[in-house]
């Protein structure tokens, strides 16, 4: 298997993201130590299993993760944090075999170990029984340029088990290798890497080829790909199947020279700048704290009005817990006097990006009609619900015309 070679720009990006980790660890350790005299230490345990070992001791005693331990052991501040009984950590430890396909530079930069550490641990306890219900978990990598939020790691569940960032399979482990007095350890079969850019995500996803072509043709890619143009972003990414549902005639028109302004107006409705909504957490930015939906008691549904790239035009998005897992839906036309909504489900949530998050959708999002004469009829809604939502060129021109601007 070929080894993964991070390029220089990714290494520099790693430095910018995680350079604050030693300071963070030192601050947290001092805080934990200062409160330890007055605060009782709860012991996390599964039934019939208790431990007095710290996370660092659990890792050090486990031969399956010795290569990971070798990397972390060279970072005394992080070792000190993992050894603090008052700390609360969760570590996603790659097993030794995971490093066989991971590229170690012959002369790694000083921050290379921090890159490994930051991507594989986060604050707070996440026990094995809680992990399957989570859409994302926290790492110690900085998620924004202001160091307000910590980058998320996405969690996928299927019949085979759990996967992190659609790359690393969570492996079975016994209690003695996973439970510590100050947190939990999970074994994974792949080394996690820093999130890729939006451009890379679109370039490497064949099912998004039409979206990528549309962004580049309309020059929206210039701002969406440029991390200096925004703090963060949430992209509701229509797949090729979504464009196909518009119909060949409408799609051909949108990608023609004459239809390009309408395509630009359409795609701007799919991008949320400077707000980051994951399936189970929300970064409002502007100095506001992270909103963790799983920590809000007695509430299984949350709605968000997210500003799109169109002035004064928002997307209403709902995150709803179904069978203990959070699911995203983009709400469409309001019906029944505000009591219910049509919705478009997110088909693949939480594709973590360097500068935000991307959610795949299999239907195109159409902005609301500005004209009172262009209200959606019950027959149109019925056709849409049955999957027959092909649009005519006349319909698109009428709907999108008022939203046209120049690149």
From Swiss-Prot:
Signal peptide: 1-35
SMART domains with a match to the protein in the record: FAS1
Entries under SUPFAM superfamilies matching the protein: FAS1 domain
Pathway: Pigment biosynthesis
Cell compartment(s), UniProt: Secreted; Secreted, Extracellular space
UniProt entry tagged with the keyword Glycoprotein: yes
Glycosylated residue positions: 52, 174, 196, 274, 312
Record field: transmembrane: none
UniProt domain FAS1: residue ranges: 52-192, 195-365
Keyword set includes Repeat: yes
Effect of gene knockout: Impairs autofusarin biosynthesis and leads to a yellow pigmentation via accumulation of the intermediate rubrofusarin.
Annotated keywords: Glycoprotein, Repeat, Secreted, Signal
GO cellular component: extracellular region
Induction of its expression: Expression is regulated by the aurofusarin biosynthesis cluster-specific transcription factor aurR1/GIP2.
UniProt-listed InterPro entries: Adhesion/Biosynth-related, FAS1_dom_sf, FAS1_domain
Assembly notes: Might be part of an extracellular enzyme complex composed of GIP1, aurF, aurO and aurS.
PANTHER family per UniProt: FI19380P1 (PTHR10900:SF77), PERIOSTIN-RELATED (PTHR10900)
Function summary: Part of the gene cluster that mediates the biosynthesis of aurofusarin, a red mycelium pigment which is acting as a mycotoxin. The first step is performed by the polyketide synthase which condenses one acetyl-CoA and 6 malonyl-CoA units to form the first intermediate, the cyclic heptaketide and yellow pigment YWA1. The C2 hydroxyl group in the pyrone ring of YWA1 is probably formed during ring closure by an aldol-type cyclization reaction. The dehydratase aurZ then acts as the first tailoring enzyme in the aurofusarin biosynthetic pathway by converting YWA1 to nor-rubrofusarin.
Protein name according to UniProt: Aurofusarin biosynthesis cluster protein S
Gene: aurS
């Amino acid at each position: 298997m070929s080894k993964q070679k991070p390029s220089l720009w990714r290494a520099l990006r790693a430095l910018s993201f995680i350079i604050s980790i030693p300071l963070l660890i030192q601050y947290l350790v001092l805080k934990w130590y200062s409160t330890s005299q007055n605060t009782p230490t709860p012991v996390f345990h599964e039934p019939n299993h208790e431990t007095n070992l710290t996370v660092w001791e659990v890792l050090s005693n486990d031969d399956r993760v010795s290569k990971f331990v070798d990397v972390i052991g060279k970072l005394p501040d992080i070792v000190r944090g993992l050894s603090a009984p008052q700390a609360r950590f969760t570590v996603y430890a790659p097993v030794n075999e995971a490093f066989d396909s991971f590229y170690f530079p012959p002369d790694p930069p000083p921050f290379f170990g921090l890159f490994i550490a930051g991507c594989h641990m986060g604050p707070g306890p996440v026990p094995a029984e809680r992990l399957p219900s989570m859409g994302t978990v926290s790492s110690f990598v900085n998620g924004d340029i202001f160091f307000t939020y910590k980058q998320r790691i996405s969690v996928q569940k299927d019949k085979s088990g759990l996967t992190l960032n659609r790359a690393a399979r969570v492996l079975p482990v016994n209690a003695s290798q996973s439970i510590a007095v100050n947190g939990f350890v999970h074994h994974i079969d792949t080394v996690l890497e820093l999130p890729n850019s939006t451009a890379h995500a679109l370039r490497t996803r064949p099912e998004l080829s039409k979206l990528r072509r549309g962004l580049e043709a309309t020059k929206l890619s210039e701002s969406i790909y440029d991390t200096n143009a925004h703090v963060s972003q949430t992209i509701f990414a229509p797949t090729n199947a979504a464009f196909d549902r518009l119909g060949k005639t409408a799609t051909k028109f949108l990608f023609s020279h004459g239809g390009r302004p309408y395509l630009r107006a359409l795609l701007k409705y799919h991008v949320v700048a400077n707000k980051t909504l994951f399936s189970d957490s929300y970064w409002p930015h502007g100095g506001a704290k992270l909103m963790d939906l799983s920590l809000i008691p007695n509430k299984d549904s949350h709605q968000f009005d997210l500003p799109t790239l169109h002035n004064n035009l928002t997307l209403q998005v709902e995150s709803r817990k179904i069978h203990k897992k959070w699911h995203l839906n983009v709400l469409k036309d309001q019906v029944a006097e505000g009591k219910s909504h049509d919705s478009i489900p997110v088909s693949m949530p939480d594709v973590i990006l360097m500068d935000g998050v991307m959610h795949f959708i299999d239907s195109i999002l159409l902005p609301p009609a500005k004209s009172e004469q262009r209200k959606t009829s019950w027959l149109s809604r019925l056709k849409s619900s049955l999957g027959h939502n092909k649009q005519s060129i006349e319909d698109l021109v009428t709907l999108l015309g008022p939203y046209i601007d120049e690149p």
